[in-house]
Design a protein with these regions (language model features):
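Conserved, mostly hydrophobic/aromatic
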Residues: 65, 96, 140, 174, ...
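Conserved small/polar residues in nucleotide/adenosyl-binding loops
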Residues: 259-266
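Flexible, glycine-rich active-site loops centered on histidine and acidic residues
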Residues: 2-22, 82-150, 194-195, 200-204, ...
Length: 276
């Protein structure tokens, strides 16, 4: 099995000491280091109204990075499908594929934070978000192929062809954020790759996610060769004390984020599992 390394990065503002402009310049510099260092890809996500993940539209960031990098692939990690109309998503992705000269890859998810659901699509729960994502994913390649009419639960539109068309044959590679076995099976059945993020349980959770992926390959992967990508947090330093302090600071910030945004299930707030 071939193992590649990529950079998953977004802007974070844990205090007011630096402006958003400064944070973006640091983001770009880190991405340039990844490109020069031979990493396979750079991934950046979509989130709204939160300083923990400042990325209102990853396509904008990737279009800018296309002019500042040379070789690295450029991916969305991830687009929150329920916040997009399929025609708009297909068109913006295709334009970004042109701007990046065919380096684009698209990660798609249902979303993780009830905080965003409540503000961008009030009343939507995690189940509906997952169903919206499952409806959106198959439409993308059909819109890129052209003359596609859609009659779904959440979207309806007459025959449409995405304009522009992507550079890559059949469009950019698609990746689905998955946790439970059903989301792994959905991704592979659709001819997509899989993104997984272990949250709380260390190596045991990684083993569990890999087991689900391998099982889904057996049942849904005939004639397909899906890849799996693991997001793992890291911190680069030469100073152990600095590493420990950074871990404490970020853990505190992350925990505050998870437990202060209201959730339909718990008014203290919680992060919903990022299964499809």
């Amino acid at each position: 099995m071939k193992l590649d390394f990529s950079l998953f990065v977004h802007m974070e503002r844990t205090d007011g000491s630096r402006s958003h402009a400064q944070l973006y310049e640091e983001f770009v510099q880190l991405c340039q280091m990844a490109d020069q260092g031979g990493m396979r890809a750079i991934w950046t996500g979509e989130h709204h109204g939160m300083n923990f993940t400042i990325a209102p539209n990853p396509f904008l960031n990737l279009a800018d990075l296309a002019r500042r990098t040379k070789n690295v692939r450029l991916g969305t990690g991830t687009i929150i499908a329920p916040f997009w109309h399929p025609i708009k998503l297909a068109g913006e992705a295709a334009m970004t594929d042109i701007i990046t000269d065919g380096r684009l890859e698209i990660g798609i998810a249902r979303g993780a934070y009830s905080y965003e659901y409540e503000r961008l699509r009030p009343g939507m729960d995690a189940w509906e978000a997952g169903q919206r994502m499952r409806e959106t994913v198959p439409t993308l390649r059909k819109l890129w192929k052209g003359d596609y009419a859609h009659e779904g639960e959440f979207h309806k539109f007459p025959a449409t062809t995405s304009s522009p068309q992507p550079v890559q044959d059949n469009g950019p590679p698609l990746w689905i954020a998955a946790r439970d076995i059903n989301s792994h099976e959905f991704a592979i059945e659709q001819g997509c790759n899989v993104q997984v993020t272990p949250l709380w349980n260390g190596d045991a959770e990684i083993d569990s996610l890999m087991e689900k992926f391998n099982e889904a390959k057996k049942t849904k992967g005939q004639g397909k060769d899906p890849k799996i990508m693991l997001l793992h947090h890291g911190y680069v330093t030469t100073d152990e004390e600095d590493a420990n302090e950074a871990a404490k600071t970020l853990s505190k910030f992350y925990c505050c984020l998870l437990y202060t945004s209201p959730s339909p299930r718990d008014q203290r707030g919680s992060r919903m599992p990022s299964s499809a």
